[in-house]
């Protein structure tokens, strides 16, 4: 299972580079990334395969990891560029009673999701 790490950084040039350099320097690949500026701070969600090693690298570089959660790094989404694909997928997840806490696109048209029931989501995705 993959890990979603939330890193809080200053909203300034170079903050994202610091994250990439810390992970790259430790041989850790970023599978997916989402970032936004919120109230003058940068909030970055990262999907990595080795959460403990990524956390160690980030904190070793003086970066603040504010949250960590198990994440599903799903297979490539068929028709990812077609209108309605995400809506149809999200409807199936909602109909199964699963709450999506975080979702973003990863490399290779894969999707990263942190949910209220990752095991149930994995079963559902196997049948999509």
Predicted regions and their residues:
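A conserved regulatory-domain signal marking ACT and ACT-like small-molecule sensing domains
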Residues: 1-128
């Amino acid at each position: 299972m993959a890990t979603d790490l939330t890193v809080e950084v200053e909203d300034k040039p170079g903050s994202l580079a610091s994250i990439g350099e810390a992970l790259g320097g430790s041989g850790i690949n970023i599978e997916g990334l989402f970032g936004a500026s919120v109230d003058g701070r940068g909030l970055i969600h990262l999907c990595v395969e080795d959460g403990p090693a990524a956390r160690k690298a980030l904190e070793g570089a003086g970066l603040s990891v504010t949250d960590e959660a198990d994440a599903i790094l799903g297979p490539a989404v068929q028709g990812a560029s077609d209108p309605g694909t995400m809506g149809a997928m999200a409807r199936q997840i909602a109909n199964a009673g699963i709450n999506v806490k975080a979702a973003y696109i990863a490399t290779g048209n894969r999707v990263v999701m942190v949910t209220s029931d990752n095991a149930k989501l994995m079963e559902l995705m196997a049948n999509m």
